[in-house]
């Protein structure tokens, strides 16, 4: 199969594995893995892809691959990753795989210099190349740019963002202090906003959009950082293997002893906000020695330090202090920041217990007194006020007027704990806002022409337990994925269609319904959550119930017990919900959703913190007193500031900014869950590539044009350098001349209606044209002028030649018209007078023989006069007949009657002469005359026989034409009947198509949900029982990895495919048949066709055999080599007819299966695709011959003028023959296509077909057909 070429087939853990096709099934292919000879498994046919011939080859741009599909994309990334080439392009999109180690000199200053001003694709893929492209686009297009760095947590987004910022400031900075400040801002932001998670040691727990602003000279003048959604819940609690924000650990590990004493710091295990997570520091061998023992937690002392090449808490503290100094923070302000951070830690150590009184409140535990004192001192609060504010809440009554009585309500232990945590979150979030503001103050700018923005925001997150933070992060990623879909897929395809480029449409999953579910007005999850917050007694359970109630049948929303993970099935319906995101289904536990959505403190704590004695603490809260209060909130109720809608507003503003700028994309990929170098988990990576839209982009870029410029834009760029004669040119003509002058290959670009477009990998050529320095433009103008002169001279030459050719053509046509006219006239005259001419010739021949009669008579001795008289009478009769034929319009029958009478007379006369002739000499002469007459008679009979044969052939042809006309009339009647029915079923078909589209979307979503569940399960969760049966390749909770068998994987793939419409139709038809052949192998079908005597089984096998051939050829056509010509096993007119007129599957000809099937023969013109446009005069036109034995083709021939005939017979050459049945080809409806058997057999024999078929029969390769049976009878 497939000429022994390898293919990629699905693999549960590696994504794909290489194998060979060994059999074609109903809707699957049987694959033999290359590394497991003798073992086979089945794979859905749409999940199998052809592989590159050289499996070790890698390319820098995936669009350069010979086969563009997700398997070769994954393999190319894998090969490059094994060579430490972590960057790869898909057109102008960069794929970055996290290496988890520092590649030497890869991001050095020398590397930066190397990429400056270089076009995309001229150097190996690099994040620097994308940064430089964004800069050049900004400079040339006079438009701000955005670089969207996306990917899941741990994929390397933060590091790539830092590299982009560093590249822009080093390459295009002014060389002043501001360049360093932009770069040094990152360590400070990371210290306060990054933390260790399960999947990432340096995970950004906030989103940021960093703008680098440029002046009119395109030099860096300043920057601005916008931040989004800091994860505040992490301040109070973390997972077992996770940590709080880096700043806490760096302060504990690296702070000098004097600062440590001032802040009352100790080891991380001493603080509630740190000791419930991981309390180990990141450290190297050197820094581990520098950390004092009393700063290390027991866990650290037992297990040692955490290792990461980019993190070192002790060393990073010093680097953070240096960064603070560089961005302008003095020692006092630095100490203020540390003081608030320490205050938050001590605040977390305040504990409560039930009060002994009847008030039902609580009091501080005795052992919490030191923590209370430290916290109050560090935050500038009164100790007693802090105690009271944490254990009571102030309420105002409205008795009879606006002013009311202040009432202090005691808080229970749980409420006091919540109040303490809320205060800690608020203080830290305000501190983080202050840090970002100070960062922005350190690189101000007065004027800005354009900016380049770099977006680094938390990637799609999915854990065993997901809360409000993951909900907001994933909502953000849904919006960004939609932006990617619109910018790269939707807008790109709309532009191609508008410009008339004829690029094939690429389908992608639209996630607008998921976004509407979250943000729709009144019924969206965010608005429902806000309404819940405004209730007097809000609850998470009520909120969850309302969400399920308002979106009961929504495809994207589901209840937890439908999760594919067992841990989620224990969650009650009012405790969570599942949202099916673009990357897969995530189960959110709604506990604390209501609390986390409210960013406001209760009145007691708000008043306390705003009246702090510490100036720095007061400043943190001055700008946030009532700015964010909910305008719908009524007086007297608890204050409410919606976190969700605030984030939604920020996100919409961000997307408006992204839509107004040019876009570049960096898709970051994490290679494995263990966060180790040189370990490639193909299944994980494939899922990330599919979710990020890379596979759809690859499909689009097969015929896409990622670079473009408008004609007017190019023309205006060159206009001031153009001489007057060139300035008059139309912009489109000027662009054409420009490209020709540069010698660009026409296949590398394409002209639209208003723009010119460039193929992927041709960015260097595009940049050469768009380069705007005066010397370069002037040089190109010279080239254009030279090309125009040459092209116009060539045009004059071609015009002269064309006029001469036209003159010759007119003369030729005139002579051809005369030739046609005289030929037609000749034919008409011939048809009219041919019988008479033939009759005259025959009669004249008879008259010539009278001389011989006279010679005989002259030799007679007696009866000469009487005999002469008889001869004269005969001669008179002949002359009379000739005159009659000449002067009278007679039919052939009349002429033959006259002629036969004369022949009889002459024969009677001859008989009489024979009686009279006695001598031998005379008898011999008479004998000779008789022989001549006998020859004449035989000649006449042969001629008559030939004439009748010609008449018979004409009759057969007329019968064939009459039959074709009858079939055409019947077809027209059927079509009229179908049109009558079509109106009734059209709506039904439209509904079915819509349902199928939705069903395919559901299948795709289920696949992503299952993959996401598998990825979560690999971190330690357990799949549900049903999913475990499907996904045997998962790591279960006990850590044992089970490999999915080939049969299990095939079953899963087949189940996914079996719901498709074509397969359902086939299976429904198969169910109605007597024989179920769905599980038969391809070879079994072929052998049965060759050997079976069961007519019904034979017909069923033939039908299934050719159906599988059609499926296989469709797969080959879809997965052909890039830019390769489509294989043609039949003329294009035949295949086009089959595509445009799909025939319904009929029920076995109503079981009428005849042994002697009808034999039909056809001939139609055939021109090879490669010669279609090279040969306008059809000099290379060939002929395609086909012999159909019943509905299926038995023999096939291709005759071309410049190559040897191609002979094919059924059985031996099935893969190269037309796989369509006779009805599907439409040949019976083509006028003049059907020929006589004799015409086919003559050509077949002349081309050596008999010997070819005989060899196939002898080698047992030919399938038994009418042709093989006739040849075998002939040989016998």
Swiss-Prot record:
Assigned keywords, A-Z: Actin-binding, ATP-binding, Calmodulin-binding, Cell membrane, Cell projection, Coated pit, Cytoplasm, Cytoplasmic vesicle, Endocytosis, Golgi apparatus, Hearing, Membrane, Motor protein, Myosin, Nucleotide-binding, Nucleus, Phosphoprotein, Protein transport, Transport
InterPro entries: Kinesin_motor_dom_sf (IPR036961), MYO6_lever (IPR049016), Myosin-VI_CBD (IPR032412), Myosin_head_motor_dom-like (IPR001609), Myosin_N (IPR004009), Myosin_S1_N (IPR008989), MYSc_Myo6 (IPR036114), P-loop_NTPase (IPR027417)
Reported modifications of this chain: Phosphorylation in the motor domain, induced by EGF, results in translocation of MYO6 from the cell surface to membrane ruffles. Phosphorylated in vitro by p21-activated kinase (PAK).
Keyword field contains Nuclease: no
Residue ranges occupied by any Myosin N-terminal SH3-like domain in the UniProt entry: 2-53
Similarity remark: Belongs to the TRAFAC class myosin-kinesin ATPase superfamily. Myosin family.
Summary of subunit composition and partner proteins: Homodimer; dimerization seems to implicate the unfolding of the three-helix bundle region creating an additional calmodulin binding site, and cargo binding. Able to function as a monomer under specific conditions in vitro. Forms a complex with CFTR and DAB2 in the apical membrane of epithelial cells. Binding to calmodulin through a unique insert, not found in other myosins, located in the neck region between the motor domain and the IQ domain appears to contribute to the directionality reversal. This interaction occurs only if the C-terminal lobe of calmodulin is occupied by calcium.
Chain residues that bind ATP: 151-158
Residues with PTM Phosphothreonine: 405, 1088, 1091
Single biological process term from Gene Ontology: inner ear morphogenesis
Compartments where located: Golgi apparatus, trans-Golgi network membrane; Golgi apparatus; Nucleus; Cytoplasm, Perinuclear region
One MF annotation (Gene Ontology) recorded for this entry: actin filament binding
Region of interest (Actin-binding), residue spans: 665-672
Myosin motor domain location: 57-771
Domain remarks in the Swiss-Prot or TrEMBL record: Divided into three regions: a N-terminal motor (head) domain, followed by a neck domain consisting of a calmodulin-binding linker domain and a single IQ motif, and a C-terminal tail region with a three-helix bundle region, a SAH domain and a unique globular domain required for interaction with other proteins such as cargo-binding. The SAH (single alpha-helix) region is characterized by a high content of charged residues which are predicted to stabilize the alpha-helical structure by ionic bonds. Its contribution to the mechanism conferring the myosin movement on actin filaments is debated.
Residue numbers spanned by region SAH: 917-984
Spans annotated as Interaction with OPTN: 1107-1109
Cited function: Myosins are actin-based motor molecules with ATPase activity. Unconventional myosins serve in intracellular movements. Myosin 6 is a reverse-direction motor protein that moves towards the minus-end of actin filaments. Has slow rate of actin-activated ADP release due to weak ATP binding. Functions in a variety of intracellular processes such as vesicular membrane trafficking and cell migration. Required for the structural integrity of the Golgi apparatus via the p53-dependent pro-survival pathway.
Sequence segments annotated as region (Responsible for slow ATPase activity): 273-317
Organism of origin: Gallus gallus
Region (Disordered): 934-957, 1117-1151
Record's bilayer topology term: Peripheral membrane protein
Protein name (Swiss-Prot/TrEMBL): Unconventional myosin-VI
Region ranges (Required for binding calmodulin): 782-810
